[in-house]
Amino acid sequence: MATEAKRPKTGDEKSVLEPLNNFLLWCESVQLTLSDKVYLSKEGTAAEYGMLAKEDIEEGHVLFTIPREALLHQGTTKVKKVLEEGKKCLESASGWVPLLLSLMYEYTSSTSHWKPYLSLWPDFRTLDQPMFWSEEECDKLLKGTGIPESVITDLRKLQDEYNSVVLPFMKSHPDLWDPEKHNLELYKSLVAFVMAYSFQEPVEDDDEDEEDDEKKPNLPMMVPMADMLNHISKHNANLEYTPECLKMVSIRRIGKGEEVFNTYGQMANWQLLHMYGFAEPFPNNINETADIKMASVYKAAAQVARSEANQQLLEDKWKMLCEMEVVGEKGVFIFGQSGSLTYHELYTTLKVLCMSSQIFEDFRENEGWEEDDEDDDDKMEQDLSFEGLASLSVEWKRLLCVAATETLDSYNEDVETDRRLMEDQRALAELSSRERRALYVRLGQKNILQRIQQLTKPAS
């Protein structure tokens, strides 16, 4: 089954084909070369725009090449000099402000070099991340997934960034930006545009000895043509970076008529929906994950710490775990399709919480170190895999089972309700695109959580 559309199909054929043809002409003018073996279309693809194979394509074939001069970012925009001069006052937590100012200028300029490219998104209506959903819809469809909380944080941050950094800078350059035209609503749309369509070049690891000098990630940039490809976890193409250009290369054989898919990385459905506005149909996403809040494991331990002495011991244990930076107030333990992905943190947490008072005192005196510590990474990973959970001690399993159950209870619907809906093809077809994507997210998470619950529940 193909992935659900990254960009829902809307509008008539003419309104889509004319901008697409203009874009292809622009590609020729900037020496963006497209292989004769592929073509762009909105028919037969997983999205309004997509790339299809005209004929069989072998592994290693270059599907298209784009020169770096055709990329859109703060170093190529017409206002790059102004942005460079104001570099200091444009610093922000996201690091996106220079790119967003570039996009605001180029998107609203009738003479922009990138106009044929940016015209593919005439009003950003195709962007459908949850940040554009109502609060009620988010809570109804996505409660428990972690997305509503992320959206609230995103909206607060972008509004603060616009008011404190972007607006003052625009007001100091009225010849280039107009706050009436380049308003918060446009800024929000462009933030979503960057989230969904930008690319970040991987940081080169030139000097492995410089461990202390951690390199900053490269800033995002817009890559025309690359963002026409849709994503699935089992992709068949990959973007490669060279000093002169970027190339999309097939990583396996692609059959005639097959869609060319890129990848955004190993992303769970909640991440895909949050950042890109789509989700892979359940159970197709091999990178699916589910989170259990660290606080839920603490609550599970608190249920059996009935005496005042035991409650104090639990608080001391948790405090030490915090000091060791193993847990945090808003932290989560992450589970994937095969078990815990944060096995070091989870193993240490379960071990400390289940220690007797004497063993914990010894542990604390040694500042978290044990002389004969046999808990290497391989053992931790195996013990907290789905193959190993059933063999854990009763105390460890109880904490995991209670925490997983609490997490499952945080959703609006139980797992069986969602599973029945997924299996009812008629009911599934009647769902809106938002309802369907939300279902894929919920069911992917619940499936993992239910497995944890089943593997750790007490023997009857």
UniProtKB/Swiss-Prot annotation:
What are the GO BP annotations of this UniProt entry? negative regulation of NF-kappaB transcription factor activity; peptidyl-lysine monomethylation; regulation of inflammatory response
Pfam families, alphabetized: Rubis-subs-bind (PF09273), SET (PF00856)
Query: Domain SET, which positions?
Result: 28-265
Q: What class of enzyme is it?
A: transferase
Determine the domain of life of the protein's source: Eukaryota
One annotated Gene Ontology cellular component of this protein: nucleus
Cellular localisation = Nucleus
Q: Does the keyword ATP-binding apply?
A: no
**Keyword terms:** Methyltransferase, Nucleus, S-adenosyl-L-methionine, Transferase
Among the GO molecular function terms of this UniProt record, one is: protein-lysine N-methyltransferase activity
User: What CDD domains has UniProt attached to this entry?
Assistant: SET_SETD6
Record keywords: Acyltransferase included?
A: no
Which Gene3D superfamilies does the annotation name?
Rubisco LSMT, substrate-binding domain, set domain protein methyltransferase, domain 1
Q: Give the enzyme's EC designation.
A: 2.1.1.-
Its function, per the record, reads: Protein-lysine N-methyltransferase.
**Family recorded in the similarity comment:** Belongs to the class V-like SAM-binding methyltransferase superfamily. Histone-lysine methyltransferase family. SETD6 subfamily.
In its UniProt entry, what is this protein called?
Answer: N-lysine methyltransferase setd6
> Which organism does this sequence originate in?
Danio rerio (Zebrafish)
Lineage of source species? Eukaryota, Metazoa, Chordata, Craniata, Vertebrata
Gene that encodes the chain: setd6
